């Protein structure tokens, strides 16, 4: 299996989910880490020398539905928990706006920012994992489109948990 240097992951419904079962959390407390996904990332993508980069749209910050400081504390906790659990470097980029922005997925600003910071220049060394793949029942295809726009491999988080996961990786058209 190919080893990726940089593994981009969406946050909501990819790495975490609400405890309440609601689409949007009731507060920063309404979340649980998806350890089955972290285990799959570690085992299947051979995380030994990889960095996990969390990329997340959080338009609720701009609209005032989510407190910026509370969300920052939540992200710091998530980053620390994943770092400790996987024993790997974890970083994140958050787009707090609903407006048109080069950072808001499906645009690639967040991915590019992390790749530049980490000096990962070869896009063949990157993969994106997300839950917005355009599958039936999903709200959009923005995670898949982000990977397409950045020209990197992509896999839906649900597909990553399957036995035949390697055949479900979508490779970019170059």
Predicted regions and their residues:
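Short glycine/serine/threonine/alanine-rich loop segments
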Residues: 50, 120, 152
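Short, electropositive alpha-helical surface patch
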Residues: 62-85, 104-118
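Conserved Lys-Pro-Asp/Glu-containing loop-to-beta segment of HAD-superfamily phosphomonoesterases
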Residues: 103-141
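Active-site neighborhood of HAD-like aspartate-dependent phosphohydrolases
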Residues: 1-53
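Short amphipathic alpha-helical segments and helix-helix/interface helices
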Residues: 38-43, 79, 111, 143-144
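Short, flexible/disordered intra-domain loops and linkers
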Residues: 22-29, 62-72, 100-104, 134-141
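Acidic, Mg2+-coordinating phosphoryl-transfer loop and its flanking beta/alpha structural elements
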Residues: 127-170, 174
């Amino acid at each position: 299996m190919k080893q990726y240097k940089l593994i981009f992951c969406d946050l909501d419904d990819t790495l975490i989910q609400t405890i309440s079962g609601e689409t949007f959390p009731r507060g920063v407390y309404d979340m649980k880490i998806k350890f089955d996904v972290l285990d799959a990332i570690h085992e299947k993508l051979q995380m030994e020398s990889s960095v996990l980069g969390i990329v997340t749209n959080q338009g609720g910050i701009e609209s005032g539905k989510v407190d910026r400081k509370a969300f920052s504390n939540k992200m710091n906790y998530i980053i620390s928990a994943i770092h400790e659990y996987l024993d790997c470097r974890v970083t994140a980029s958050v787009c707090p706006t609903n407006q048109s922005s080069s950072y808001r997925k499906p645009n690639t600003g967040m991915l590019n920012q992390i790749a530049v910071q980490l000096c990962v220049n070869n896009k063949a060394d990157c993969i994106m994992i997300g839950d917005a793949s355009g599958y039936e029942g999903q709200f959009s295809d923005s995670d898949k489109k982000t990977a397409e726009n950045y020209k990197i491999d992509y896999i839906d988080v649900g597909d990553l948990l399957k036995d035949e996961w390697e055949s479900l990786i979508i490779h970019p058209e170059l």
